[in-house]
A protein has these predicted regions:
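Hydrophobic "anchor" residues on beta-strands that sit immediately upstream
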Residues: 1
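Short glycine/threonine-rich catalytic loop with a Thr-x-Gly-x-Asp
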Residues: 86
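Active-site donor-binding loop signature of nucleotide-sugar glycosyltransferases
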Residues: 34-35, 79, 95
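Low-complexity, intrinsically disordered Gly/Pro/Thr-rich segments
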Residues: 72-82, 90
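Active-site metal-binding loops of divalent metal-dependent hydrolases
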Residues: 4-6, 89
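Active site of divalent-metal-dependent phosphoester/diester hydrolases
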Residues: 8-72, 83
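Short, well-ordered beta-strand micro-motif
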Residues: 64-66, 92-96
Length: 96
């Protein structure tokens, strides 16, 4: 599992690099949101309650990447949009 604030959006080429195959044949990582919610847009995780400038757009820049072996164990991925203790919203995965 690799998780955190990556300071990039889903459309950034670096996100594509995170889920690209490894040169040595190791299976690629998977974005947990994409696994749990295929085709569903990412909810915002940044600038919901704290904006540097009025009108700053909300962004999704917090990701959880899973190894191939963990993907079948993924049960849920949610963004807690109510918490106001940081400028980022928690992204929570449930594995079983």
């Amino acid at each position: 599992i690799i998780t955190g604030d990556f300071n990039l959006e889903y459309t950034d080429p670096l996100h594509a690099r995170m889920v690209a195959p490894f040169a040595d044949g190791t299976p690629p990582l998977a974005d947990a949101w994409d696994v749990a919610h295929p085709g569903v847009p990412y909810p915002p995780t940044f600038r919901i309650y704290e904006k540097e400038q009025p009108g700053d757009p909300e962004l999704h820049c917090d990701f959880i990447f899973l190894s191939e072996g963990l993907c079948p164990r993924l049960r849920a991925v949610v963004v807690d949009g109510q918490t106001q203790v940081s400028d980022h919203q928690p992204v929570i995965v449930t594995l079983a």
